[in-house]
């Protein structure tokens, strides 16, 4: 019974982590294209490296939280960083939680308009209502959503990738360091990790961290590889589109495009609820308001910022928060290694 409980808790934690990372930027194929495919033949090595980094970070974060009994993001930063660096990172990351939620809101609006042919604001309203319901029911609801949707995400991406075949185009290397690109990609995608995992059930088993890490690293590298290969199999025209994975899926037939739509919507929802939870906890801690008031504030701000297009969030806003992600990632790994 104890073993079964440990496995379930670890699996839930891994699903929450994966659901948090696999947002609209990942599911659209835009992140995979910009951070990996544009490096030509080196993209596979970069994808493997990113998987290893996800493994290390998720293992370290989980282990640090378990060993120190950490319950909040602020406590986590005090442990791994401390001082002014922790304060700076916490405030920048707190803003990032809000921005990520706004980006997922914009992505839902874009999906409503581009995929379903309905009003942009209908999509925005729908995602806000669903997120509000889940967030009000706490971390348990987020875990349930993640453990249902993440396996479906992986299956959907796999099904599309299998149909795509093995023939791919060659991309001219744009130059630069694929290792640095992978590092930046992982750093900003894991900013929310500590805030969300700190709210999950702690597990005393010493293998919790490494199993969580293996599941997260393997899933992210596998899905990234499948998305990248699918895009390359569809030709150079698809590579240059705003949502390359959607364009590649559409070329495979209506059934596979519908599978992509399901993948995209699931990725938007899982990331939105994780970042929404983190944003609300940050607001409660800093301005001392109730969860309900913090949720209302989040929804109002999301409506105000929804006029920014999703593509602008990914290309112009995300990179601004990279420094907080890099600081957190480096200090997390440094602390983890030092304590071992």
Predicted regions and their residues:
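Small-residue-rich segments of transmembrane alpha-helices in multi-pass membrane proteins
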Residues: 21-22, 46-47, 79-90, 149-165, ...
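Membrane-interface loop-to-helix entry segments
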Residues: 81, 108-112, 118-164, 314-332
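Hydrophobic alpha-helical segments and their helix-loop junctions in multi-pass secondary transporters
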Residues: 24, 98, 142, 151-175, ...
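Extracellular/periplasmic helix-exit of transmembrane alpha-helices
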Residues: 58-62, 184-185, 218-248
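Transmembrane-helix boundary/entry motifs in multi-pass membrane transporters
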Residues: 38-44, 67-97, 114-120, 245-261, ...
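Hydrophobic, membrane-embedded alpha-helices of multi-pass small-molecule transporters
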Residues: 9-27, 94-97, 101, 161-167, ...
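Juxtamembrane transmembrane-helix boundary signature
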Residues: 17, 48-74, 230, 234
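Extracellular loop-to-transmembrane helix junctions
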Residues: 9-11, 35-62, 211-225, 317-326
């Amino acid at each position: 019974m104890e073993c079964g409980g440990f496995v379930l808790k670890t699996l839930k934690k891994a699903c929450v982590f994966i659901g948090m990372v696999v947002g609209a930027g990942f599911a659209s194929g835009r992140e995979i294209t910009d951070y990996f495919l544009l490096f030509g033949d080196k993209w596979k090595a970069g994808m493997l490296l990113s998987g290893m980094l996800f493994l290390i970070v998720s293992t370290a974060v989980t282990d640090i939280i378990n060993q120190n009994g950490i319950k909040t993001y602020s406590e986590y930063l005090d442990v791994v960083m401390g001082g002014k660096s922790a304060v700076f990172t916490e405030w920048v990351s707190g803003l990032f939680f809000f921005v990520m939620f706004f980006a997922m809101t914009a992505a839902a609006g874009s999906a409503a308009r581009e995929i379903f042919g309905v009003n942009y604001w209908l999509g925005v309203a729908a995602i806000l209502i669903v997120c509000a319901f889940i967030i009000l029911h706490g971390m348990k609801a987020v875990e349930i959503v993640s453990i249902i949707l993440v396996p479906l995400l992986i299956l959907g991406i796999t099904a599309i990738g299998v149909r795509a075949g093995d023939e791919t185009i060659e991309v001219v290397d744009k130059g630069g360091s694929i290792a640095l690109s992978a590092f930046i990609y992982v750093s900003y995608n894991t900013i929310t990790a500590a805030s969300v995992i700190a709210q999950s059930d702690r597990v005393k088993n010493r293998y919790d961290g490494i199993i969580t890490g293996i599941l997260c690293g393997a899933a992210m590298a596998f899905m990234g590889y499948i998305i990248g290969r699918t895009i390359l199999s569809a030709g150079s025209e698809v590579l240059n589109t705003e949502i390359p994975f959607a364009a590649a899926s559409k070329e495979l037939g209506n059934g596979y495009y519908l599978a992509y739509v399901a993948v995209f919507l699931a990725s938007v929802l899982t990331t939105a609820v994780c970042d929404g939870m983190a944003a609300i906890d940050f607001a409660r801690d800093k301005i001392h308001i109730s969860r309900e008031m913090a949720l209302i504030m989040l929804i109002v701000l999301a409506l105000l910022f929804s006029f920014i297009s999703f593509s602008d969030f990914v290309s112009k806003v995300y990179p601004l928060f990279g420094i907080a992600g890099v600081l957190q990632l480096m200090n997390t790994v440094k602390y983890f290694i030092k304590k071992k």
